Amino acid sequence: ESIDCEAYCRQYRSQLNRIPPFVVLIPSYGDIGFCWEPFDRYNRVTSRGRIAIPMYTKNLKTALLTATADLRWQVAKEKASYYWMEEGLTGNYYQWFQTQKLKGDVKEYFIEDYLVWMTKESEGIQKLEREVRNVFWRFMPFSKDIKEELKTRAPIYQELYQKDLNRQMSDGY
């Protein structure tokens, strides 16, 4: 959460509410966590989701990140409803997926890219494609401290940071 400050936040009436999910420990081995349920179907606004994590993992950070990525994907997809392929995080990522003509599950690619985003890109190591980095920077922004540090590292981050500033200035009108 120190890197992805809005990982467990949902917006309601133009206010961000932090709603951490319940963590279900599964008595198994593995490195992959997953989203059991993004939120309760009767209370989508304030209900806590459920993520499942194996008890015995080689790398707990990877298990938590895959579960968080799955939770983010499911929440964004449910929020966009019928338009999940057209708008928001899932829509923009899906459009990139289609232009690349990739095969397979979009969510699996998203989870892999989210792992790279949180482990490599947050440290300034550029591993993602430019379009994916743009989508993640816009819809899953880093904390302000990380953004300030990254803008001095590479011109691509400086450009993304400048786009953020321009977007903030235009939102005021």
How should these model regions be labeled?
Residues 2-173:
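Active-site-flanking segments in enzyme catalytic domains
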